[in-house]
Amino acid sequence: GKDHISGGIAQTDVLGIFGKYGVFLATRWGDSGSYITSAYNIYLNYDGKGSKYGDICVKAETSDIENMPVYASIHSDNEGRLHMIIINRNWDKEGIAKINIGGNRTYTSCTIYGFDYQSPEIRKMGEVNNIQNNYFELKIPPLTVYHIVF
């Protein structure tokens, strides 16, 4: 599925799993294709300017692991940004992510980058500027990968 959204979703998901469980090394060979490239870049260059997902995994839980896995991280350099990867694997249903951020830091806004079944191009998908008490709800279209930066 290197040139299909299913491949992009699977690769994004496995990279999140590897980070969550501290996999030290994994290899891949062959042509990456458009969606596999996007899966790597959603972690390594989500804004086209070299910005990266954090290097310290933080707790992220979902009540629907089958359809909407979630991964989260922060940066060790203390820059304060929280990163969240949310995937909607569902072929035909929009997902509603009820995001409740724990910890002692207050977040009031975030920017969303992602790709979907329509295009492997990672692009800015929107912003949320009304986060209240570290909680908000986000609609995620079918077959979509979001990288949310707080």
Task: Give the positions of each predicted feature.
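Acidic/histidine-rich, metal-coordinating catalytic segments
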Residues: 1
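Glycan-recognition and catalytic regions of carbohydrate-active enzymes
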Residues: 4, 8-11, 15-82, 121
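Carbohydrate-binding surface patches
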Residues: 65-106, 146-149
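C-terminal beta-strand-rich structural cap/linker in extracellular carbohydrate-active enzymes
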Residues: 129-150
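Active-site-proximal beta-strand/loop segments in catalytic clefts of secreted hydrolases
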Residues: 28-31, 86-90, 115
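Ser/Thr- and Asn-enriched, surface-exposed coil loops between beta-strands
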Residues: 59, 64-66, 78, 93, ...
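Solvent-exposed beta-hairpin/edge-strand motifs
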Residues: 102-122
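Short conserved micro-motifs at the rims of enzyme active sites and ligand-binding pockets
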Residues: 96-98, 122-125
